[in-house]
């Protein structure tokens, strides 16, 4: 008699803003995430399993799905959705495992909603959990080992997600963590400041296996370890790829490294500029940013045909109602190729959250609103609604037709990339108001979701 395969379902939940059904985009403009392909590749070979992966950004979750185990990766903005899905599957006697940044930041919040949680990176603990589950002894919690490193693990299995539903599947990761300690950042709060690095040859092998001509590196700070970064850039130069990634503004102070970045094929970088106020930056422990140097940073990148996605946050303590248009105008005048704006979010477990909690300024613990576009705390020098509407105004100013057309003329990005990204962000800017509603502030406590009825006529969990 043939033994039945273990049915494992891996889900990446999404909040209302980015969900496939009812979200801001009719189709995904995202690149393929690496979490689900990584988790799928980590399933031990000795476990005969059928793995199903569902990304709610591109598809629906079937309420009647058949599975022996459901695993979900959770960020704070998707926690309420993850808990809703977990309650549904557990009501059907399907065990649920939760992991990811939110679970690592506040495991005590996630534990009641799951049969087991994984705290920290999953490379060691996810396979151990699966072996325990197969043997009937799954524990309630698995913690990342102290001697964790990123060597010796299988490459992500990108076949578990439909490539054609993403802008690209050529997504790669060389390192994790960041050496800085910015007050509002999740990374040092969840995983510390020690960079974890994959062997450079493993990255080269993955790029070759994917036959990538263009690539996105999702490392939060590619230059956390400059020596390692230089080795990586030297190694990928012969591949003659175009690549995009993330770095800090400090890269532009290191001209030899910046030249190597350009020579290796970099065509675009995301940098957290955050604010045009030096006092804001100092308070946020990001004093290495200097707004007076931002135009120089843009110029140095453009000289090397590297485009800049510059990210700003609003709601820091020095911000007044004038900051929104000041920042948007600055972004346009500085010729930033792709400005991006967000409401500063005090994610649980971060130093910012602890400070605002002490000051009595946290207004909501409805995790669904912790998405970078909703206000969940009391700003110091403006109202909640001013912060909410001002952020929307900055988006609309920066992505007016006149400013989009101006950017297309000077952008360092390839023309088709500049056109696609600017039109996508213009679309986003003009639909944000659909998701802005300050009425929820009158009820800051989390509303419990209604039970989901699993019936043949309603097989999609909305």
Each model region followed by its residue ranges:
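Radical SAM enzyme core and accessory elements
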Residues: 2-10, 17, 48-53, 65-68, ...
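Acidic, low-complexity intrinsically disordered segments
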Residues: 2-210, 214
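Flexible glycine/acidic-rich beta-alpha junction loops that bind and position SAM and/or redox cofactors
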Residues: 13-20, 108-109, 180, 227, ...
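A structural motif corresponding to the C-terminal end of an alpha-helix
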Residues: 39-50, 210, 297-308, 334, ...
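Alpha-helical structural signal in soluble globular domains
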Residues: 42-46, 88, 92, 109, ...
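Short, electropositive alpha-helical surface patch
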Residues: 62, 67-76, 230-236, 240, ...
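Structural recognition of alpha->loop->beta junctions
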Residues: 109-128, 260-270, 326-341
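Radical SAM [4Fe-4S] cluster-binding motif and immediate context
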Residues: 155-309, 316, 322-329
